[in-house]
């Protein structure tokens, strides 16, 4: 199992708009690709930065499926995101492999 983690620091001035858009538009669009098993929206509570930081963890079965997402779907979805929020909610991505569950 692969976890595709997107970490985003959201400016206070757009927080409510951002959270609504992510829950009602962006995350459902990512899941509608039918490549991901699930997603969770997580608020990072140990962060001392200004604004609020979130980590969205998307679970996907394999790196090959993630590559398919990156090639076929991500460019359009990232463009939509960038046109709305990039300067007020920058994101970075981390890809993790689940080694074991307890």
Residue spans of the language-model regions?
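A broad, structure-centric signal for solvent-exposed, well-ordered loop/edge residues
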Residues: 17, 37, 46-48, 67, ...
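A generic structural signal for alpha-helix starts
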Residues: 12-17, 64
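Short, well-ordered beta-strand segments in beta-rich or mixed alpha/beta enzyme
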Residues: 3-9, 42-72
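Short amphipathic alpha-helical segments
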Residues: 15-40, 76-79
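Glycine-rich beta-strand-turn "strand-cap" elements at beta-sheet edges
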Residues: 40-49, 80-102
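Short N-terminal helix-initiation segments at or just after the protein's N-terminus
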Residues: 1-7, 35-42, 57, 78-86
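A short, structured loop/turn motif at beta-sheet edges
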Residues: 33, 61-64, 101
